[in-house]
Design a protein with these regions (language model features):
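Conserved alpha-helical "signature site"
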Residues: 1-248, 288-289
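Terminal helices and disordered tails flanking the catalytic cores of nucleotide-processing hydrolases
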Residues: 1-9, 252-289
Length: 289
Protein backbone atom coordinates (compact mmCIF):
# COMPACT_ATOMS: atom_id res chain seq x y z
CA UNK A 1 0.00 0.00 0.00
CA UNK A 2 2.48 2.60 -1.13
CA UNK A 3 1.02 4.29 -4.19
CA UNK A 4 -0.78 7.62 -4.50
CA UNK A 5 -3.88 5.61 -5.39
CA UNK A 6 -3.83 4.10 -1.90
CA UNK A 7 -3.91 7.57 -0.38
CA UNK A 8 -6.97 8.38 -2.50
CA UNK A 9 -8.62 5.12 -1.46
CA UNK A 10 -8.22 6.03 2.21
CA UNK A 11 -9.75 9.45 1.58
CA UNK A 12 -12.71 7.98 -0.32
CA UNK A 13 -13.37 5.35 2.37
CA UNK A 14 -13.33 7.96 5.12
CA UNK A 15 -15.56 10.42 3.28
CA UNK A 16 -18.35 7.84 3.34
CA UNK A 17 -18.55 7.69 7.14
CA UNK A 18 -21.84 9.14 8.44
CA UNK A 19 -21.58 12.33 10.54
CA UNK A 20 -18.39 13.58 8.87
CA UNK A 21 -17.71 17.25 9.74
CA UNK A 22 -18.30 18.30 6.13
CA UNK A 23 -20.79 21.07 6.98
CA UNK A 24 -18.32 22.92 9.22
CA UNK A 25 -16.77 25.11 6.48
CA UNK A 26 -20.22 26.37 5.42
CA UNK A 27 -21.24 26.90 9.04
CA UNK A 28 -17.99 28.80 9.71
CA UNK A 29 -18.67 31.11 6.77
CA UNK A 30 -22.20 31.76 8.06
CA UNK A 31 -20.95 32.34 11.62
CA UNK A 32 -18.58 35.02 10.35
CA UNK A 33 -21.32 36.67 8.27
CA UNK A 34 -24.11 39.08 9.07
CA UNK A 35 -27.41 38.56 10.86
CA UNK A 36 -29.01 37.97 7.45
CA UNK A 37 -27.30 34.57 7.49
CA UNK A 38 -29.16 33.38 10.61
CA UNK A 39 -31.98 31.80 8.62
CA UNK A 40 -29.55 29.79 6.54
CA UNK A 41 -27.65 28.81 9.68
CA UNK A 42 -30.89 27.60 11.27
CA UNK A 43 -31.72 25.53 8.18
CA UNK A 44 -28.26 23.95 8.17
CA UNK A 45 -28.41 23.01 11.85
CA UNK A 46 -31.90 21.55 11.48
CA UNK A 47 -30.56 19.11 8.89
CA UNK A 48 -28.72 17.31 11.70
CA UNK A 49 -31.03 16.17 14.49
CA UNK A 50 -28.20 15.43 16.91
CA UNK A 51 -26.60 18.82 16.40
CA UNK A 52 -29.95 20.61 16.74
CA UNK A 53 -30.55 18.77 20.02
CA UNK A 54 -27.13 19.79 21.37
CA UNK A 55 -27.73 23.44 20.40
CA UNK A 56 -31.11 23.56 22.16
CA UNK A 57 -29.77 21.75 25.23
CA UNK A 58 -26.92 24.24 25.56
CA UNK A 59 -29.18 27.26 25.03
CA UNK A 60 -31.40 26.03 27.86
CA UNK A 61 -28.53 25.08 30.18
CA UNK A 62 -28.02 26.88 33.47
CA UNK A 63 -25.15 28.92 32.03
CA UNK A 64 -27.17 30.45 29.19
CA UNK A 65 -30.77 30.12 30.38
CA UNK A 66 -33.00 33.12 31.00
CA UNK A 67 -36.59 33.32 32.25
CA UNK A 68 -37.85 32.10 28.89
CA UNK A 69 -37.14 28.67 27.47
CA UNK A 70 -35.67 28.30 23.97
CA UNK A 71 -37.93 26.05 21.92
CA UNK A 72 -36.54 26.74 18.45
CA UNK A 73 -33.14 26.80 16.78
CA UNK A 74 -33.66 30.42 15.73
CA UNK A 75 -34.16 31.43 19.38
CA UNK A 76 -31.11 29.38 20.39
CA UNK A 77 -28.95 31.10 17.76
CA UNK A 78 -29.95 34.52 19.07
CA UNK A 79 -29.28 33.49 22.67
CA UNK A 80 -25.95 31.77 22.09
CA UNK A 81 -24.49 33.92 19.35
CA UNK A 82 -22.84 32.61 16.21
CA UNK A 83 -19.38 32.03 17.73
CA UNK A 84 -20.66 29.88 20.60
CA UNK A 85 -22.92 28.07 18.16
CA UNK A 86 -20.03 27.29 15.86
CA UNK A 87 -17.96 25.94 18.75
CA UNK A 88 -20.81 23.60 19.69
CA UNK A 89 -21.10 22.43 16.08
CA UNK A 90 -17.35 21.91 15.69
CA UNK A 91 -17.15 19.87 18.89
CA UNK A 92 -20.30 17.84 18.25
CA UNK A 93 -19.66 16.99 14.60
CA UNK A 94 -15.94 16.29 14.86
CA UNK A 95 -16.29 14.41 18.13
CA UNK A 96 -19.14 12.25 16.90
CA UNK A 97 -17.08 11.32 13.85
CA UNK A 98 -13.95 10.50 15.82
CA UNK A 99 -15.64 8.05 18.20
CA UNK A 100 -16.24 5.48 15.44
CA UNK A 101 -14.56 2.18 16.36
CA UNK A 102 -11.16 1.92 14.69
CA UNK A 103 -8.04 -0.19 15.00
CA UNK A 104 -4.43 0.94 15.15
CA UNK A 105 -2.28 3.29 17.20
CA UNK A 106 -3.08 1.38 20.39
CA UNK A 107 -6.25 3.44 20.86
CA UNK A 108 -9.05 2.52 23.20
CA UNK A 109 -12.54 3.56 21.99
CA UNK A 110 -12.79 7.36 21.94
CA UNK A 111 -9.08 7.98 22.53
CA UNK A 112 -8.49 10.07 19.41
CA UNK A 113 -11.56 12.12 20.25
CA UNK A 114 -10.25 12.75 23.78
CA UNK A 115 -6.81 13.66 22.50
CA UNK A 116 -8.16 15.98 19.78
CA UNK A 117 -10.37 17.72 22.34
CA UNK A 118 -7.35 18.10 24.63
CA UNK A 119 -5.28 19.62 21.78
CA UNK A 120 -8.18 21.97 20.98
CA UNK A 121 -8.40 23.20 24.58
CA UNK A 122 -4.61 23.58 24.78
CA UNK A 123 -4.62 25.59 21.54
CA UNK A 124 -7.47 27.81 22.69
CA UNK A 125 -5.81 28.50 26.05
CA UNK A 126 -2.37 29.22 24.57
CA UNK A 127 -3.90 31.46 21.88
CA UNK A 128 -5.53 33.59 24.58
CA UNK A 129 -2.50 33.69 26.87
CA UNK A 130 0.01 34.51 24.13
CA UNK A 131 -2.26 36.65 21.94
CA UNK A 132 -1.81 34.35 18.96
CA UNK A 133 -4.96 35.10 16.99
CA UNK A 134 -8.57 34.01 17.27
CA UNK A 135 -9.09 31.45 20.05
CA UNK A 136 -12.13 29.91 18.31
CA UNK A 137 -10.07 29.24 15.18
CA UNK A 138 -7.34 27.69 17.33
CA UNK A 139 -9.92 25.45 19.03
CA UNK A 140 -11.29 24.16 15.72
CA UNK A 141 -7.80 23.66 14.32
CA UNK A 142 -6.95 21.54 17.35
CA UNK A 143 -10.04 19.39 16.85
CA UNK A 144 -9.34 18.58 13.20
CA UNK A 145 -5.53 18.52 13.15
CA UNK A 146 -5.12 14.73 13.05
CA UNK A 147 -8.08 13.45 11.02
CA UNK A 148 -5.68 11.61 8.70
CA UNK A 149 -4.70 9.21 11.47
CA UNK A 150 -8.33 8.40 12.09
CA UNK A 151 -8.77 7.82 8.35
CA UNK A 152 -5.84 5.39 8.23
CA UNK A 153 -7.13 3.50 11.25
CA UNK A 154 -10.67 3.43 9.84
CA UNK A 155 -9.30 2.01 6.58
CA UNK A 156 -7.99 -0.86 8.73
CA UNK A 157 -4.44 -0.62 7.42
CA UNK A 158 -2.49 -3.65 8.65
CA UNK A 159 0.57 -1.56 7.83
CA UNK A 160 -0.10 0.37 11.06
CA UNK A 161 0.91 -2.76 12.97
CA UNK A 162 4.10 -2.86 10.92
CA UNK A 163 4.84 0.75 11.86
CA UNK A 164 4.17 0.05 15.54
CA UNK A 165 6.56 -2.90 15.47
CA UNK A 166 9.38 -0.98 13.75
CA UNK A 167 9.34 2.29 15.72
CA UNK A 168 11.70 3.21 17.37
CA UNK A 169 14.11 0.37 16.53
CA UNK A 170 14.24 1.07 12.78
CA UNK A 171 12.74 4.55 12.58
CA UNK A 172 13.36 7.44 14.97
CA UNK A 173 9.98 9.07 14.31
CA UNK A 174 6.51 7.84 13.41
CA UNK A 175 6.45 10.26 10.47
CA UNK A 176 9.56 8.68 8.97
CA UNK A 177 8.04 5.21 9.32
CA UNK A 178 4.82 6.32 7.61
CA UNK A 179 6.74 7.67 4.62
CA UNK A 180 8.72 4.46 4.15
CA UNK A 181 6.06 1.86 4.96
CA UNK A 182 2.91 3.55 3.61
CA UNK A 183 4.50 5.69 0.95
CA UNK A 184 2.71 8.77 2.31
CA UNK A 185 2.07 10.49 5.64
CA UNK A 186 -1.11 10.79 7.70
CA UNK A 187 -0.81 14.57 7.31
CA UNK A 188 -1.30 14.15 3.55
CA UNK A 189 -4.55 12.30 4.25
CA UNK A 190 -5.69 15.10 6.59
CA UNK A 191 -4.87 17.68 3.93
CA UNK A 192 -6.81 15.77 1.26
CA UNK A 193 -9.87 15.37 3.48
CA UNK A 194 -9.98 19.02 4.54
CA UNK A 195 -9.54 20.21 0.96
CA UNK A 196 -12.25 17.83 -0.18
CA UNK A 197 -14.67 19.21 2.41
CA UNK A 198 -13.84 22.81 1.52
CA UNK A 199 -12.14 23.88 4.77
CA UNK A 200 -10.35 27.26 4.65
CA UNK A 201 -6.62 27.21 3.87
CA UNK A 202 -5.75 27.93 7.52
CA UNK A 203 -7.08 24.54 8.61
CA UNK A 204 -5.60 22.75 5.60
CA UNK A 205 -2.17 24.17 6.52
CA UNK A 206 -2.60 23.01 10.11
CA UNK A 207 -3.45 19.48 8.99
CA UNK A 208 -0.54 19.40 6.56
CA UNK A 209 2.24 21.03 8.61
CA UNK A 210 1.42 20.76 12.32
CA UNK A 211 4.25 18.23 12.79
CA UNK A 212 6.79 20.42 10.96
CA UNK A 213 5.65 24.06 11.20
CA UNK A 214 9.00 25.36 9.94
CA UNK A 215 8.03 23.95 6.54
CA UNK A 216 4.76 25.91 6.44
CA UNK A 217 4.97 28.84 4.01
CA UNK A 218 3.56 32.30 4.65
CA UNK A 219 1.33 33.83 7.26
CA UNK A 220 -0.28 30.57 8.44
CA UNK A 221 2.92 29.39 10.10
CA UNK A 222 1.92 31.05 13.39
CA UNK A 223 -1.29 29.05 13.90
CA UNK A 224 0.42 25.88 12.64
CA UNK A 225 3.13 26.40 15.28
CA UNK A 226 0.43 27.05 17.88
CA UNK A 227 -1.12 23.63 17.14
CA UNK A 228 2.36 22.07 17.20
CA UNK A 229 2.86 23.51 20.70
CA UNK A 230 -0.65 22.52 21.80
CA UNK A 231 -0.01 18.97 20.62
CA UNK A 232 3.17 18.89 22.70
CA UNK A 233 1.32 20.03 25.84
CA UNK A 234 -1.61 17.66 25.21
CA UNK A 235 0.78 14.73 24.84
CA UNK A 236 2.33 15.62 28.20
CA UNK A 237 -1.14 15.69 29.79
CA UNK A 238 -1.84 12.27 28.29
CA UNK A 239 -5.52 12.07 27.34
CA UNK A 240 -6.00 9.62 24.46
CA UNK A 241 -2.35 9.60 23.36
CA UNK A 242 -1.69 6.70 20.98
CA UNK A 243 1.49 4.68 20.58
CA UNK A 244 2.62 7.21 17.96
CA UNK A 245 2.42 10.12 20.38
CA UNK A 246 5.90 9.89 21.80
CA UNK A 247 7.75 9.51 18.50
CA UNK A 248 7.65 13.07 17.23
CA UNK A 249 10.36 15.70 17.40
CA UNK A 250 9.59 19.26 18.55
CA UNK A 251 10.26 21.92 15.91
CA UNK A 252 12.48 24.11 18.08
CA UNK A 253 13.08 26.65 15.32
CA UNK A 254 9.37 27.31 14.76
CA UNK A 255 8.60 27.40 18.49
CA UNK A 256 11.36 29.94 19.08
CA UNK A 257 10.26 32.04 16.11
CA UNK A 258 6.72 32.41 17.51
CA UNK A 259 7.98 32.94 21.06
CA UNK A 260 6.98 29.73 22.81
CA UNK A 261 8.92 28.86 25.95
CA UNK A 262 8.73 25.56 27.80
CA UNK A 263 8.05 27.26 31.13
CA UNK A 264 5.14 29.26 29.69
CA UNK A 265 3.54 26.14 28.24
CA UNK A 266 4.01 24.30 31.54
CA UNK A 267 2.47 27.23 33.42
CA UNK A 268 -0.69 26.96 31.30
CA UNK A 269 -1.28 23.30 32.19
CA UNK A 270 -3.33 23.85 35.42
CA UNK A 271 -5.84 26.06 33.55
CA UNK A 272 -5.94 23.60 30.65
CA UNK A 273 -6.57 20.67 32.99
CA UNK A 274 -9.36 22.56 34.74
CA UNK A 275 -11.07 23.16 31.39
CA UNK A 276 -10.54 19.60 30.17
CA UNK A 277 -12.17 18.22 33.31
CA UNK A 278 -15.36 20.08 32.36
CA UNK A 279 -15.55 18.01 29.18
CA UNK A 280 -13.94 14.67 30.06
CA UNK A 281 -15.11 12.84 33.17
CA UNK A 282 -12.71 10.84 35.40
CA UNK A 283 -14.04 7.68 33.71
CA UNK A 284 -13.17 9.10 30.28
CA UNK A 285 -16.71 9.95 29.17
CA UNK A 286 -16.72 12.90 26.75
CA UNK A 287 -19.21 15.75 27.18
CA UNK A 288 -19.07 18.35 24.42
CA UNK A 289 -21.95 20.53 25.61
Amino acid sequence: MKSAADLQTVVEMTRSIPCAPAILPKLLKLAEGSSSDLGEMEMLINLDTGLATDVLRTANSAFFASNQRCDSISDAILRLGSKVLYRIAASTLTGRWLVHPVRGYGWEPGDLCRHSLCVAICAETLAKKMHLGDAATAYTAGLIHDLGKFALAYANFTALDDITNRVPDEFATWREAEKVILGFESTQVTKALLENWGFPSTFVSVGCYYQTPSECPGRERKIVTLIHAAKHVATQIGYGVGVDGFYYEPDELALKEVGFKEEEMDAAIPEILSTIQCFISPSGEIRFT
